Amino acid sequence: MPLEFGIHAASQIGRATGKPDDPAAIDRLVRDLQGAGSFVVREYLHFLGEPADPEKARLLRPADRLRALTMPDHWYADGRHLDLVLCYQPEEPDIAGWLSFIDEVIARYGHLVRYLQITLEPNFPIEWIDGSSPGILEALIRGVPHARRALAAAGYHDVALGFSVAEPAEWLGGDEPFWAALAAVPPAEFAEHIDYIGLALYPDAFSPVPADAVADLIRHGITHLRETCLPQAHLTATTPIHLCENGTPTAPDRTPAEQAARLETMIRTIASCAKSANITVYELFGLRDPVSANPEPLTQLGITTDDYTPKPAYATYRTLIGELGAR
């Protein structure tokens, strides 16, 4: 089953920030990766509420991002599809503000968006991720149908709507209460509005994992989501999974060649599961390191260094897109 491939092309990752993004370099590299097919580009917008956390406001620049993304509007042509993630991270619950934010985003970017994701990993309660934000379940459960109505009112009937999770649960200490909460929501109020589920898988990015264990961890994460979690939320096998975030870093104990080999294992494993698990989209995280000299995993997830010099994983990804991608 061919996959639609894509990438997170900007380099801001939570607190990890480095040199400013270079739109010309992004354009050159994405065009090279894309080839003649379609290609997904993932971007993030943040609702921080009032008053916003000062550090998040400084690094994430939500007002600036609501005006302009990393690349200009006209760039989203020639088969490039915008996957826009709306993150909910206020200091206090603010559902009214969140719903207004969704409306603002649709008014500004609805004409560009192909995939609209409501919340980022609401099952994952760590800082800088939506699962740690007060009111997150209500933000998800009310945000999805609100976005559907807003899209329909604006005439954007081709936008696919979803949310993402990080799985499997044992990597996170368990997320049973999250899925139980979705199980309690009548399908007409939530599940029937969902066009896809995003899955973030980083089996070897944040803990030591031998290379020969990576494929099994990928398969387990996909199977756990499809067979254990989604049925609880009234989401059937006909609802596609997007591998919306996946990557493996270079590190002091992982060479660029090893990064490339692990990435190939991950992508080939995901592709082998695509038909049985109904996986339709794969997005790599990400294009460029925020800070290549920093040994932290988040700062070296790129397939290019922080000056856009390709690592071996860049050529690997390009080859896999040509081999496994939808044309």
Describe every region a protein language model picked out.
Residues H8, C87, I136-A180, L230-A251, ...:
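Aromatic-lined carbohydrate-recognition surfaces of secreted/lumenal glycan-active proteins
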Residues A16-L33, D94-A107, G173-P187, A260-S272:
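Short, acidic/polar
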Residues I26-Y109, S132-S164, A211-I218, L235-T236:
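Aromatic-lined substrate-binding rim segments of carbohydrate-active enzymes
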Residues L29, L59-R65, G155, P187, ...:
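Glycoside hydrolase catalytic-domain groove-lining segments
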